[in-house]
């Protein structure tokens, strides 16, 4: 497994554990109210599982799978840039929600996440080839 894929998968597993833990706390809070502020974990739970775990795992596996047939990976900088962009975006969105930061900070987090997706697409696009070229 390439080093970048390993970093993506490890980070995805950390987000999975965090998201699962927050989800468990939210579920337990429904049965036995723990604290009124427990519900403030819901946006972080969603962010960690949807973007932190799912997208990051998909990026890690996609980077590992592509390219096919022993071709070169091309310029690695956009792919390596995806990792900090996505993680910074996830944490900025989560912290903006928890700490009641201004709305622009949450928008900035989403922009970082979108930039991460664009960087990964920029890297992966030339590596996706049809099975049989005409």
Regions found by a protein language model. Name each.
Residues 1-134:
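Hydrophobic alpha-helical transmembrane segments of multi-pass integral membrane proteins
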């Amino acid at each position: 497994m390439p080093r970048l894929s390993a970093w993506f998968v490890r980070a995805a597993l950390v987000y999975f554990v965090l998201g699962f833990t927050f989800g468990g706390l939210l579920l337990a809070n429904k049965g036995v109210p723990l604290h009124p502020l427990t519900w403030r974990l819901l946006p972080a739970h969603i962010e960690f599982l949807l973007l932190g775990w799912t997208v990051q795992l998909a990026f890690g596996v996609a980077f590992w799978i592509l390219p096919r047939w022993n071709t070169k990976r091309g310029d690695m900088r956009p792919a390596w840039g995806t990792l900090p962009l996505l993680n910074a975006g996830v944490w900025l969105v989560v912290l903006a929600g928890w700490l009641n930061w201004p709305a622009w900070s949450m928008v900035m987090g989403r922009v970082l996440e979108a930039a991460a997706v664009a960087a990964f697409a920029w890297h992966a696009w030339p590596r996706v080839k049809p099975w049989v070229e005409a």
